[in-house]
Amino acid sequence: MLWFKNLMVYRLSREISLRAEEMEKQLASMAFTPCGSQDMAKMGWVPPMGSHSDALTHVANGQIVICARKEEKILPSPVIKQALEAKIAKLEAEQARKLKKTEKDSLKDEVLHSLLPRAFSRFSQTMMWIDTVNGLIMVDCASAKKAEDTLALLRKSLGSLPVVPLSMENPIELTLTEWVRSGSTAQGFQLLDEAELKSLLEDGGVIRAKKQDLTSEEITNHIEAGKVVTKLALDWQQRIQFVMCDDGSLKRLKFCDELRDQNEDIDREDFAQRFDADFILMTGELAALIQNLIEGLGGEAQR
């Protein structure tokens, strides 16, 4: 659960107080509570260590991890449509007239309210890591929307959260394209066998290469024809593999077995100690990877 699978990276745009003791109280005000009978969705904080601790924050070496849970009620459109049509047909038969659009819209709200208490719930959890040493916030999710929702919850909890997506001085896609074109990456990184190339033209095509030599003539021809690399699978120090995206996010993080097994000497029964050790190990590696990546991509954009 702890090992992050994706990274959406944000930079704190100014210094703010992020002390765990203070945060614990602030997050408690927005702790997760389940949906009521008429709620479509609810989001709040839960302990990152699950049932093993009541604490809403876990801290080590200036790194803080927190966890947001979201509950969403599932009401399939066909179910709503069927119930609404039945209600409309019944009323039209009783009143011997066609209902107006405003009346139908009002009925739809009634139908939704009647169905909500019986709807199934879908739960999801999103981990967030706050690096107070380097002034970064990382969200473990694959979509910017989900990351923004989690950041919005934190902003509401803290009262203020001045963050911007981490951005580079040079467009990331141009740097990735040059790495593939030349076959030479920044120090510490190696090309793997997967990439996505897009045409710069609005209605241009997209090429997805998998299990392919990215230095081959076929890929070079696409680049010479005007396509740029928007996603690129990379290996870092033979420790972490990931897909670098042109929006600055890292997808499909895969930690090498040697790295993941580093804390195997800790008894798995001692969940808290193992969680803490894995958290220190993971954040240490990822912080080094992010720093290496910033340098390799030509440096962070000036703010």
Curated annotation (Swiss-Prot):
It is found in: Cytoplasm, Nucleoid. The keyword Cytoplasm applies. One of its GO terms (molecular function) is double-stranded DNA binding. Pfam families: RdgC. Disulfide bonds: none annotated. InterPro entries: RdgC. Its main location: cytoplasm. Keywords: Cytoplasm, DNA recombination. The keyword Cytoplasm applies. One of its GO terms (biological process) is DNA recombination. One of its GO terms (cellular component) is cytoplasm. Belongs to the RdgC family. May be involved in recombination. This is Recombination-associated protein RdgC. The gene is rdgC.
